[in-house]
């Protein structure tokens, strides 16, 4: 047994070290004071410092990292298969392969826990802003949904459109305006104040769509990364969502609320329209589940331009429904639940309660 341990000493020590690190993290994460201190004074300052370097490059360093990691993984698996065929001690080779995969996976998970998971246990945006989610009656939900629909109809005329009436503002223009969108909200939400950089467009955006992602924040580089293949009408509010993660807001439901509230307050007609569109979708979905007839009455008031944007978006995402999409959703759902979002991906719907508290 001792000889067996010595033969794979490096991998065993690696596994024990990562396991110990995760054990410490899980033991200490219920301590809010410590999590707040780590988030505000260690983790987020570190990520912003790393981001300031990564933003010197136009290419997403996060995307490059994923491509390199995938390439290394493919090369490693191919090398292991070659050794299994050409060399003796196949059991030893297989064991090392298994242990390497486990150690690598746990190390990446530990990195996400330390660089991002801590923020799930620090003060939430609700605690920092004083805006707490609340339940509401169907009548209240109907009133706020109708108000969003009315504002959305007015805002629809203030954005460029193509010959089919669909949103046609260039993505370059949307990205260029991103760094000034948060400024008008700083007075009301000082916890959101930070220096912004232009988010990164992902070259392999179709792959993101296949996994049902409109964007992602990468804590290892501090970059906000966006899917630029999907319809652009939701891109501005999605940018604000990912930039909320850069501010240490971990909860998806809170970032959706921030995306809507900041977009509406931005003074930029393109971002305002996108924020209203996102808000209407969340509120409308909740109202439809509660009372389809009330939802239909409001839906019938939308102009053709808004309907065109909603249909274009629905048609785009419907084309990606399948096993890859389902698998990616399950993986992300598990990650959210492991970090305290008990409803997993369903927690996105809770944004309605925050919208009702703020706009109701």
Summary of predicted features, one role per range:
Residues 73-78, 91-126:
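Transmembrane alpha-helices and immediately adjacent membrane-cytoplasm interface residues
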Residues 4-18, 96-101:
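Alpha-helical transmembrane segments and their helix-start/interface "positive-inside/aromatic belt" motifs
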Residues 19-82:
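Membrane-embedded alpha-helical segments of integral membrane proteins
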Residues 160-228, 232:
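Auxiliary, metal-adjacent structural segments of Zn-dependent hydrolase domains
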Residues 117-185:
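Membrane-interface segments at or immediately adjacent to transmembrane helices
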Residues 139-143, 148, 250-295:
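Post-HExxH zinc-binding segment in Zn-dependent metallohydrolases
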Residues 305-360:
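Pan-zinc metallopeptidase signature
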Residues 58, 235-256, 260-261:
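Active-site recognition of the HExxH zinc-binding catalytic motif
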């Amino acid at each position: 047994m001792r000889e067996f341990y010595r033969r794979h000493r490096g991998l065993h020590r690696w596994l024990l070290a990562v396991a110990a690190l995760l054990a410490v993290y899980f033991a200490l994460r219920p301590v809010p004071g410590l999590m707040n201190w780590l988030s505000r004074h260690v983790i987020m300052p570190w990520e912003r410092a790393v981001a300031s370097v990564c933003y010197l490059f136009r290419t997403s360093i996060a995307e490059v990292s994923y491509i390199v990691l995938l390439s290394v993984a493919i090369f490693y698996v191919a090398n292991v298969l070659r050794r299994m065929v050409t060399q003796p001690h196949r059991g030893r080779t297989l064991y090392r392969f298994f242990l390497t995969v486990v150690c690598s996976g746990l190390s990446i998970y530990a990195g996400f826990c330390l660089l991002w998971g801590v923020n799930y246990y620090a003060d939430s945006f609700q605690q920092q802003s004083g805006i707490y989610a609340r339940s509401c009656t169907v009548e209240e939900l109907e009133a706020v949904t109708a108000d969003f629909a009315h504002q959305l109809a007015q805002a629809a005329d203030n954005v460029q459109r193509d010959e089919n009436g669909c949103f046609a503002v260039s993505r370059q223009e949307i990205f260029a305006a991103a760094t000034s969108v948060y400024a008008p909200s700083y007075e009301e939400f000082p916890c959101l104040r930070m220096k912004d950089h232009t988010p990164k467009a992902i070259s392999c955006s179709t792959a993101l769509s296949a996994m049902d992602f409109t964007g992602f924040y990468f804590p290892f580089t501090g970059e906000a990364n966006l899917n630029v293949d999907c319809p652009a009408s939701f891109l501005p509010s999605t940018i604000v969502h990912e930039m909320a993660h850069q501010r240490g807001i971990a909860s998806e439901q809170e970032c959706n609320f921030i995306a809507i509230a900041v977009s509406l307050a931005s003074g930029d007609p393109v971002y305002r329209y996108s924020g209203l569109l996102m808000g209407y979708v969340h509120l409308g979905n909740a109202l439809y589940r509660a009372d389809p007839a009330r939802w239909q009455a409001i839906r019938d008031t939308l102009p053709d331009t808004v309907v065109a944007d909603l249909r274009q978006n629905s048609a785009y995402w419907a084309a990606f429904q399948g096993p890859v999409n389902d698998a990616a959703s399950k993986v992300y759902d598990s990650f959210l639940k492991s970090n305290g979002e008990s409803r997993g991906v369903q927690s996105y719907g809770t944004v309605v309660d925050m919208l009702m508290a703020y706009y109701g």
